[in-house]
C-alpha cells in the first residue's frame, strides 16, 4: 500500500544470518524481486560485542557462516542479478566500529568494497537484474537458475 500511494519503499537485508544457506539467500532474492520496492540495502552479518548474537556465536560458532570478503562479493553479485534494475541498491556492506566488531573484519572502506564488487561484476560480464524480467514499474520475477 505504501508504494501504491507514491511513497518510496525500501528493504533492508542482512546476508548470512545463522542457519541461512547460499541457496536460500538466492531464493530470497527472487522473492524480494517481486515486492514493490524502490530501494534495497544489503549488508553482511556482523557480530557485535555485548549482543545476544555474540553470545550465541561464542556458544555455537558452527551455526554461523562468516563470509570472507571475496565469497561475500560473489554472493552479493549473485543476489543482485535477481533484483530488478529499477530497485536502487543503497548499500552492500555495513561498517561497525572496530572496538565493537567481533567479526568479520575485512579492513575495507565502503568505497574499496564497491570498487572490488564492480570490478568482479565486470570480470563476470554481469549486471543488476540480469536474471530478472521486469513486470510493471518496480516489480519483477527472476529466472530460477538453481
Which residue stretches match the model-derived regions?
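Radical SAM/AdoMet-radical enzyme domain recognition
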Residues: 1-14
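Catalytic cores of alpha/beta
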Residues: 18-34, 99
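Conserved radical SAM core fold
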Residues: 14-19, 47-49
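Alpha-helical scaffolding segments of alpha/beta enzyme cores, especially the outer helices
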Residues: 1-4, 27-31, 71-74, 78
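Intrinsically disordered, low-complexity linker/tail regions enriched in Pro/Ser/Thr
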Residues: 31-40, 44
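Auxiliary Fe-S-binding modules of radical SAM enzymes
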Residues: 39, 46-146
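Alpha-helix C-cap/termination motif
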Residues: 5, 34-35, 82-83
Amino acid at each position: 500500500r505504501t508504494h501504491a500511494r507514491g511513497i518510496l519503499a525500501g528493504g533492508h537485508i542482512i546476508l548470512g544470518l545463522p542457519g541461512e544457506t547460499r541457496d536460500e539467500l538466492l531464493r530470497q532474492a527472487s522473492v524480494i524481486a517481486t515486492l514493490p520496492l524502490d530501494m534495497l540495502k544489503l549488508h553482511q552479518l556482523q557480530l557485535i560485542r555485548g549482543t545476544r548474537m555474540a553470545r550465541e556465536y561464542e556458544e555455537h560458532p558452527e551455526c554461523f557462516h562468516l563470509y570472507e570478503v571475496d565469497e561475500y562479493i560473489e554472493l552479493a553479485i549473485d543476489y543482485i542479478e535477481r533484483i530488478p534494475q529499477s530497485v536502487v541498491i543503497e548499500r552492500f556492506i555495513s561498517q561497525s566500529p572496530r572496538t565493537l566488531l567481533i567479526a568479520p573484519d575485512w579492513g575495507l572502506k565502503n568505497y574499496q568494497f564497491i570498487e572490488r564488487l564492480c570490478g568482479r561484476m565486470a570480470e563476470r560480464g554481469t549486471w543488476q537484474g540480469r536474471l530478472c524480467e521486469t513486470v510493471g514499474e518496480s516489480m519483477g520475477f527472476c529466472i530460477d537458475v538453481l
